[in-house]
Amino acid sequence: MYGIEYTTILIFLTSITLLNYILKSITRIMDYIIYRFLLMVVILATIINAQNYGVNLPITGSMDTAYANSTQSEPFLTSTLCLYYPVEASNEIADTEWKDTLSQLFLTKGWPTGSVYFKEYADIAAFSVEPQLYCDYNLVLMKYDSTQKLDMSELADLILNEWLCNPMDITLYYYQQTDEANKWISMGSSCNVKVCPLNTQTLGIGCLITNPDTFETVATTEKLVITDVVDGVNHKLNVTTATCTIRNCKKLGPRENVAVIQVGGANILDITADPTTTPQTERMMRINWKKWWQCFYTVVDYVNQIIQTVSKRSRSLNSSAFYYRV
């Protein structure tokens, strides 16, 4: 009997000793792994000095403070600037080194080499389809053209604001706009847009829903159309779908890291009077037209003042993807 008790006690003590040994071994192994990991982190931190310019990476968070207008301002070292210009600018300059020249000039204003990106676009229609406003700050140069002033004004409204859009099937359904922030956006090589307001019996008001020729014309041969109709009223739409797409969109608010610079023109585009533009902050500027070199020199000279009108933020880097979000 005493032998059985001694054996039980011995087994119990042996188990405790073995468990204690195992726990100590696990502790030593974990300490080894943790210390090695921390050592590697310290070593890598001393030899790696990477900078994230944010290109092709999502930017989220609250609005940052506007930077001071100074050629010695160090915050620009961690910011990127995209300058969008029409293809005719590079064609006129005809210099393979012109971007390098501008980069060196931007350096004198506190923008390091490699922080300024030059983005070329063919025309307003192509740019409106896929703006790709990737940088922390985005400046869009648009040369004034009296034949495209409506497209220019609506392009400014498109890129200076953020929109949530859904596709529309105008062959099957009637549509109505719920409030002032609700617009119908059409874009393509040639957009003709006609509307027919309907009463509560779905009969046309001043038009016949079966005859598009009686519809009210709101746009003719435009590349970009932002249509605003009477809220709360159903409409039958007629759009040249072969050369144009239309979407039902909601203006979410200002895209605060974008500024539009109008180049030349006697008339000045201004969308701040739009009641849906809140806050009504002027982020559209105009510079006199001479030659494209002169325009770029002006932008470089006043870049830090222009940056004061915008903020380093954006809900979506790829504005076209955000625009087509369904």
From Swiss-Prot:
Annotated spans, GPR motif: 253-255
Predominant localisation class: virion
Keywords assigned: Calcium, Capsid protein, Disulfide bond, Glycoprotein, Host endoplasmic reticulum, Host-virus interaction, Metal-binding, Outer capsid protein, Signal, T=13 icosahedral capsid protein, Virion
Modification after translation, per record: N-glycosylated. The N-terminus is blocked possibly by pyroglutamic acid.
Disulfide bond annotation, renumbered to this chain: C82-C135, C165-C249, C191-C244, C196-C207
Record bears the keyword Plastid: no
UniProt-annotated binding residues for Ca(2+) 2: Q177, D228, V229, D231, D301
CNP motif: annotated segments: 165-167
Subcellular location(s) per record: Virion; Host endoplasmic reticulum lumen
Keyword Calcium: yes
Binding site for Ca(2+) 1: D95, G206, T214, E216
Domain of life: Viruses
Entries under Gene3D superfamilies matching the protein: Glycoprotein VP7, domain 1, Rotavirus outer-layer protein VP7, domain 2
Glycosylation sites: N69, N238, N318
Signal sequence extent: 1-50
GO MF entry, a single one: metal ion binding
HAMAP family the record matches: Rota_VP7, Rota_VP7_A
Entry similarity comment: Belongs to the rotavirus VP7 family.
Role summary: Calcium-binding protein that interacts with rotavirus cell receptors once the initial attachment by VP4 has been achieved. Rotavirus attachment and entry into the host cell probably involves multiple sequential contacts between the outer capsid proteins VP4 and VP7, and the cell receptors. Following entry into the host cell, low intracellular or intravesicular Ca(2+) concentration probably causes the calcium-stabilized VP7 trimers to dissociate from the virion. This step is probably necessary for the membrane-disrupting entry step and the release of VP4, which is locked onto the virion by VP7.
Additional detail: Some rotavirus strains are neuraminidase-sensitive and require sialic acid to attach to the cell surface. Some rotavirus strains are integrin-dependent. Some rotavirus strains depend on ganglioside for their entry into the host cell. Hsp70 also seems to be involved in the entry of some strains.
Subunit structure: Homotrimer; disulfide-linked. 2 Ca(2+) ions bound at each subunit interface in the trimer hold the trimer together. Interacts with the intermediate capsid protein VP6. Interacts with the outer capsid protein VP5*.
Name this polypeptide is given: Outer capsid glycoprotein VP7
